[in-house]
């Protein structure tokens, strides 16, 4: 009986290990030069940051949380979400942040149609700078 229980437990345990899917390894972003050269004209602007906070809560927070990539929807994604509070992320150009946040790729959705107003897009980037 003990051998049977051990065998069943071993099989169940082994199958449970197979059900876990590791997050996708972080791959480099291929950002076109035209985006890399873009500048945020609203950087540091209090009104833009306030607007950006509202827009971020609507469109970004469910996955990104408060910038660490730990929002309530994050666990359901295959891709590890970028931590936008790190020095490495903050060192990116305005245009790189714009491309990553607005154009997106893979599981990061494209927000160009959902957020058609350029000022609102940059407001989100301005708010993200404060996280």
Q: Which residues does each predicted region cover?
A:
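Extracytoplasmic/secreted proteins, especially bacterial periplasmic and envelope-associated proteins
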Residues: 44-47, 51, 55, 96, ...
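Axial heme c-ligation environment in periplasmic c-type cytochrome domains
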Residues: 22-24, 75-82, 100-131
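Electrostatic cytochrome c docking/interface patches
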Residues: 25-55
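Short microdomains enriched in Cys/His and/or Lys/Arg
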Residues: 82-91
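Short Fe-S-cluster ligation motifs
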Residues: 90-100, 104
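N-terminal export/membrane-targeting signals
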Residues: 1-23
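Alpha-helical hairpin
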Residues: 44, 89, 115-116
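Periplasmic/extracellular electron-transfer cofactor-ligation site
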Residues: 32, 47, 53-79, 107-110, ...
